Amino acid sequence: MRPPRGGGSFRGRGGRDNGGRGRGRGRGRGRFGGGNYDEGPPSEVVEVATFLHACEGDAVFKLSNVKIPHFNAPIYLQNKTQIGRVDEIFGPINESLFSIKMREGIVATSYSQGDKFFISPEKLLPLSRFLPQPKGQSGGRGEGRVPPRGRGPPRGRGNFRGRGAPRGASRGFQPRGGPRGGFRGRGRA
């Protein structure tokens, strides 16, 4: 087994490898190149947009759903035949447009204005995700809440003294106004 990237050893918290918490395992294996993997047709599709026009090989659509499609989400005909993937989303938020990168062998000019296109409901996001949240409403991380704590031990556990804190734990908290200063090092047992 190789040591974690950037960590240099198996001891401690893993250095720059995000704490050695398993994120680095299996990198590159089992993934499909660039998200272009054909997932097959979904069990259900809903109308998402109508065709406006072709532009430089891509197709431009007007959103007809109240939700916004994911970037790179597959777009289908009503019979669940995939024609391409969402490339760009643009325009005013209440009249959004998006372009589709067509699949190989499918020509954007073969469709006419008003043709309907479909998407898996799992690939849609609510419009509220793209709107500013009013102050005080629970939104993103840390807004209006107690700030998240780091990796250290729970409060009230005191101070770890001596050499070599337990694996994955910090050196503890110093009381307010207590000694501040240099780095003591990790220590080797």
Curated annotation (Swiss-Prot):
Pfam families: Gar1. Disulfide bonds: none annotated. Keywords: Nucleus, Repeat, Ribonucleoprotein, Ribosome biogenesis, RNA-binding, rRNA processing. InterPro entries: Gar1/Naf1_Cbf5-bd_sf (IPR038664), H/ACA_rnp_Gar1/Naf1 (IPR007504), Transl_B-barrel_sf (IPR009000). Residues 1-39, 129-189 are annotated as: Disordered. The keyword Nucleus applies. It comes from the Eukaryota. GO terms for molecular function: RNA binding. GO terms for biological process: pseudouridine synthesis; rRNA processing. Signal peptide: none annotated. Residues 1-12 have a biased composition (Gly residues). GO terms for cellular component: chloroplast thylakoid membrane; nucleolus; ribonucleoprotein complex. Required for ribosome biogenesis. Part of a complex which catalyzes pseudouridylation of rRNA. This involves the isomerization of uridine such that the ribose is subsequently attached to C5, instead of the normal N1. Pseudouridine ('psi') residues may serve to stabilize the conformation of rRNAs. Belongs to the GAR1 family. This is H/ACA ribonucleoprotein complex subunit 1-like protein 2. It comes from Arabidopsis thaliana. The lineage of its organism: Eukaryota, Viridiplantae, Streptophyta, Embryophyta, Tracheophyta.
